[in-house]
């Protein structure tokens, strides 16, 4: 995996919400722009709405995050769940002016840029809620954009390619070009990817059923 996503939740300054605690206590739902079920913008928003009881009104049907950004800046929606990597590269102006506030992270651990922004998993009140959040975080984070090989590929070949990939992704020229484009190279090894996928495949039937119900 060349880059792992860290999904975060950004809300508009105009909502008056500056923290997850304020959001949880809000009486009015924040309209969140989303693409559709199956996309990270929708799935991550829906799972925290259900698992944490966050007041969110999902407005889906946008054709991408660029139209959602336009809707955000026009006041049509008041928030978005997207990867921090995307926020940092395409929402720089809104972040610098404080027009968007990052108040919650969906990932398993805080992104180094956001050490004080709480994790959704830590706000969950039940074991089921934590499992729901963890599953969606893995599916749209650590296991996103995988490089895969066909079944039956000899293990020695897999090992060679895994090692070569991780060495290539550390190439100084590549990292320099990525830095110029404000893109984050945040690789996950083949072993980590395999572990994450196996964990998703081992989800309890009750959790799978609940996710199907939530993310339909």
Task: Identify the residue ranges that each predicted region occupies.
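Short, surface-exposed amphipathic charged segments that create phosphate/polyanion-binding patches used
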Residues: 71-76, 117-121, 201-203
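A short acidic, often aromatic-flanked loop/helix-cap motif at beta-alpha or helix-coil junctions
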Residues: 40, 66-67, 110-112, 193
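Short secondary-structure boundary segments
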Residues: 13, 83-85, 106-107, 151
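An extracytoplasmic/periplasmic, membrane-proximal ligand-sensing/linker region
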Residues: 97-99, 103, 116, 125, ...
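Short beta-strand->loop
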Residues: 1-2, 55-61, 78, 91-140, ...
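Short helices/loops that flank or line small-molecule/ion binding pockets
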Residues: 46-47, 51, 66-80, 85, ...
């Amino acid at each position: 995996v060349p880059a792992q996503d860290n999904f975060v939740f950004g809300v508009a300054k105009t909502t008056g919400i500056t923290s997850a605690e304020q959001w949880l206590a809000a009486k009015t739902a924040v309209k969140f722009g989303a693409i559709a079920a199956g996309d990270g913008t929708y799935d991550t928003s829906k799972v925290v709405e259900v698992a944490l009881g966050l007041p969110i009104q999902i407005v889906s049907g946008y054709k991408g995050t660029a139209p959602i950004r336009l809707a955000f800046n026009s006041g049509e929606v008041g928030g978005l769940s997207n990867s921090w990597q995307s926020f940092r590269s395409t929402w720089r102006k809104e972040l610098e002016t404080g027009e968007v506030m990052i108040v919650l992270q969906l990932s398993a651990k805080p992104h180094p840029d956001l050490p004080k922004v709480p994790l959704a998993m830590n706000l969950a009140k039940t074991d089921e809620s934590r499992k729901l959040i963890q599953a969606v975080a893995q599916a749209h984070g650590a296991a996103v954009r995988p490089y895969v090989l066909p079944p039956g590929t000899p293990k020695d070949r897999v090992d060679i390619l895994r090692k070569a990939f991780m060495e290539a992704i550390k190439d100084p020229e590549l990292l320099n070009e990525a830095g110029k484009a404000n893109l984050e190279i945040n690789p996950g090894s083949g072993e980590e990817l395999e572990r994450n996928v196996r964990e998703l495949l081992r989800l309890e039937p009750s959790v799978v059923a609940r996710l199907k119900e939530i993310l339909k």
